[in-house]
A protein has these predicted regions:
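Soluble "head" domains of membrane/secretory-pathway proteins
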Residues: 1-183
Length: 183
């Protein structure tokens, strides 16, 4: 999406806006700075473009009044053996991905309708019931807060474990996710 002051984290703000800007696509997994808390990086899927009407009804994402195609697939099995319902969602532009439904009546399963303002985007996590995203306090994400498109999971550990806590790696490292390319 080009470069912004957030693209170069260790440099002082050299310019306003974006250089060599391009627009993100619906379905992109995006790294962005959280609005109003710009020292916090988030990574979520872009589901709403400027002008879109976004709503979740009974756990089903709706874009501009049309429910997104959602197909039940094989359950995800949590580490404790608990089966978690998993769905394949397909956005109107054909981008497809898996989502988890940890609880059938979570806070984000029924929302008001959101109308995405110009120059902003609506983001949601794929783990819908465990995601602070645009349905909640993240809100609409301005274009200038986008850092870039996520392309690979470089490193992955469980929960809130810091990658620097190497003594926890034997129990908390998730080797199956390391170097996973994001579609």
């Amino acid at each position: 999406y080009g470069f912004s002051q957030y693209s170069m984290p260790l440099s002082p703000p050299l310019f306003d806006g974006r250089v060599m800007a391009s627009q993100p696509d619906r379905g992109d997994v995006v790294v962005f700075r959280k609005p109003r808390e710009e020292d916090v990086d988030y990574i979520k899927r872009l589901v709403g473009l400027p002008g879109d009407r976004i709503q979740v009804v009974d756990g089903v994402l709706s874009i501009n009044g049309k429910p997104v195609e959602r197909e039940k697939v094989e359950d995800f099995v949590a580490e404790d053996g608990t089966p978690v319902p998993r769905f394949r969602e397909t956005l109107p532009n054909g981008v497809s991905y898996m989502t988890l439904d940890l609880s059938p009546n979570s806070a984000g399963d029924n929302t008001r309708e959101f109308v995405v303002p110009e120059g902003h985007y609506f983001m949601m996590g794929d783990n819908r019931d465990n995601s602070l995203d645009s349905r909640f306090d993240v809100g609409y994400v301005p274009f200038e807060n986008l850092v870039g498109k996520a392309q690979v999971i470089f490193f992955s550990v469980e929960g809130d474990v810091s990658p620097l806590e190497i003594w926890k790696w034997p129990t908390d490292l998730r080797p199956g996710r390391i170097l996973t390319w994001l579609g």
